[in-house]
A protein has these predicted regions:
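Glycine-rich phosphate/pyrophosphate-binding beta-alpha loops
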Residues: 164, 168, 227-243, 307
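Glycine-rich beta-strand-to-loop/alpha-helix junction loops that act as flexible
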Residues: 8, 82-84, 106-108
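Short glycine-/acidic-enriched loop or helix-start segments at secondary-structure transitions
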Residues: 15, 90-92, 115-116, 170, ...
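Short hydrophobic segments within beta-strands
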Residues: 5, 106, 256-258
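ATP/NTP phosphate-donor binding region
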Residues: 1-79, 89, 93, 97, ...
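ATP/nucleoside-binding phosphotransfer catalytic cores, i.e., glycine-rich phosphate-binding loops
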Residues: 15, 214-216, 241-328
Length: 328
């Protein structure tokens, strides 16, 4: 059974056209499916929660009847996400990760850091046929970002690509809140909005003293932090290759700290990251399962490019190994 969760507005409205193409393909193949088209924020997560909770209960009930034997495997239920990184992240935060379901992904967004990192085809026909004829799977890690909420309670958010504090979060926030972004999207000038966001973020960036604590043991201090990114995959912020040492499903985060006193060097570093260059001066990388990050100056934070617009000084990140079964 296939469950399609579609964001029709993803990719500046391209999501609906992509879904119509997919619908014609699966209709020709007489495939049984259910489709859920989102109409607003957080609806994708709500759909994912309902689908996966139902599948888990169904699986547990059937397994009990069959004396603990597995009644169905994850491959028999596939939840297909049609949207961008934001839609995927929303579904990740809504779904029951213990449900017997595999994930198919048709990337339609603008940044597409997840698809870029996994080297997924941008061709709709290619992706949907790979999902329908699923042969290759990969168990992906996901991360958890923890921050203090307004009421003092800890707030948790899952991420599949990256989470961070500082410049990378500021770039994401600027691009998402840019008034001309919808127009740039319709004109297929998404790179222009990304360029403006990066440029203005670098121009206004202020470094901070701070430190990271790795696995609760090793503390490393810095004098000029511009950003700290916890990477599960190589790319973030619409194609910036920050997490060069990030492994796919290795159970560890790649903590990338950019510390440099020169704003000119910062701009060069962002340009090199956007160009996929191998070496970035001032960028230090550490591997760990969990980390605490502190900066003396409050910075914006993000998870998978989604920033709430609130500045903070402390975040915690951790990695959950191999829980997302993905059709590659």
């Amino acid at each position: 059974m296939y469950y399609f969760i579609v964001n029709p507005n993803s990719g500046s409205g391209r999501g609906l056209r992509v879904w119509q193409t997919i619908e014609r393909i699966i209709a020709r193949k007489h495939i049984e499916y259910e489709a859920y088209l989102t109409e607003g924020p957080e609806q994708a997560g709500a759909y994912a929660a309902a689908i996966t909770e139902s599948l888990r209960k169904q699986y547990e009930s059937t397994a009990e009847e069959e004396s603990g034997e597995k009644a169905e495997t994850a491959e028999e239920h596939v939840m297909v996400i049609v949207g961008g990184d934001g839609t995927f992240s929303e579904i990740l935060n809504g779904m029951d990760t213990d449900a017997p379901v595999a994930i198919g992904y048709v990337p339609v967004g603008v940044g597409n850091d997840l698809a870029r990192s996994l080297r997924l085809s941008r061709s709709v026909n290619s992706r949907i046929h790979r999902i329908l004829r699923a042969k290759k799977y990969r168990n992906l890690d996901y991360g958890i970002m923890t921050v203090d909420g307004a009421d003092g309670e800890a707030c948790h958010r899952r991420f599949i690509v990256s989470s961070g504090i500082g410049l990378d979060a500021d770039i994401c926030h600027r691009e998402d809140s840019m008034m001309l972004k919808p127009l740039f999207g319709k004109l297929r000038l998404d790179r222009l909005s990304r360029f403006f966001a990066r440029y203005h973020s670098c121009r206004s960036a202020v470094p901070s003293k701070g430190y990271i604590v790795l696995n609760g043991e090793r503390r490393v201090e810095f004098n000029n932090i511009f950003f700290v990114s916890a990477m599960l995959l190589p790319y973030e912020c619409g194609g910036m290759k920050i997490g060069r040492e990030a492994g796919l499903g290795n159970g560890e985060l790649s903590i990338c700290v950019y510390s440099n006193s020169s704003r000119t060097e910062l701009m060069n570093a962002i340009r090199r990251a956007a160009g996929g260059r191998r070496k970035i001066r001032g960028l230090r990388t550490y591997s760990c399962k969990e980390a605490k990050i502190h900066t003396e100056i409050p910075f914006l934070v993000h998870a998978d490019g989604e920033s709430g617009g609130n500045a903070m000084t402390d975040i915690q990140v951790s990695c959950v190994k191999g829980k997302i079964r993905m059709i590659i």
